[in-house]
Regions:
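Acidic/histidine-rich, metal-coordinating catalytic segments
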Residues: 47, 59-77, 95-97, 148-153
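A short acidic/small-residue loop/turn micro-motif
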Residues: 23-24, 34-41
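RNase H-like polynucleotidyl transferase catalytic core
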Residues: 64-71, 85-104, 118-122
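C-terminal domain-tail junction helix/linker
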Residues: 78, 85-89, 110-168
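Mobile-element integrase/transposase regions
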Residues: 1-22, 45-49, 53-56, 62, ...
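Mobile genetic element proteins and their domesticated derivatives, centered on retroelements
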Residues: 4, 21, 27, 47, ...
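Hydrophobic (often cysteine-bearing) scaffold residues that line and stabilize catalytic clefts
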Residues: 18, 39, 43, 68, ...
Length: 168
């Protein structure tokens, strides 16, 4: 799983930070949370949402997802390290000044911002609604050359789709 924060400014409200968990293989957005800070608690809140959404919080899995992040202060905090230990998750941090390591999530945030910044949002709830709508569009309708859409790849439907196309 890749994770990162992205910034949004709402006039009259200040800065908001979007914490996202993206599945590295499929590019599927598993979970996201709009936060007023970028602390370890914001990361663990988003991770809890992702574990629940993916079923990893209740299923018996041999390997929990591994977290890939940059070296931002919330990701190098001892609190996050303890939380990951408690949940049996490994953490890999990209090399400093090498954003390509998290290329997929950087690209996701860029795509989201290009779309959402064109819209008018005046309240945090408006921004949250815009993000939610775009996550749904991105996961279920946006086509990627190599995998179809992220939901198909994440849920394992893409192989059946590829096979059905090859028989035509």
């Amino acid at each position: 799983w890749q994770t990162d924060f992205s910034y949004f400014k709402i006039i009259g409200w200040g800065w908001f930070y979007l914490s996202t968990i993206l599945d590295d293989y499929s590019r599927y957005i598993i979970a996201w949370k709009l936060c007023t800070t970028m602390k370890a608690d914001d990361v663990t809140d988003t991770l809890n949402l992702a574990l629940k959404a993916s079923g990893c919080d209740s299923a018996k899995v041999i390997h929990k997802p591994r977290l890939l992040s940059d070296n931002g202060s919330s990701y190098i905090s001892g609190d996050l390290a303890d939380w990951l230990d408690d949940h049996g998750m490994d953490h890999v941090r990209g090399a400093p000044y090498h954003p390509q390591t998290q290329g997929k999530i950087e690209r996701w945030h860029q795509t989201l911002k290009n779309r959402v910044l064109l819209e008018n949002y005046f309240l945090p709830g408006d921004l949250e609604n815009q993000i939610g709508d775009f996550v749904d569009h991105y996961n279920n309708h946006r086509y990627h050359e190599s995998i179809g859409n992220p939901a198909d790849a994440y849920l394992g439907r893409h192989t059946a789709i590829i096979e059905s196309h090859s028989h035509h």
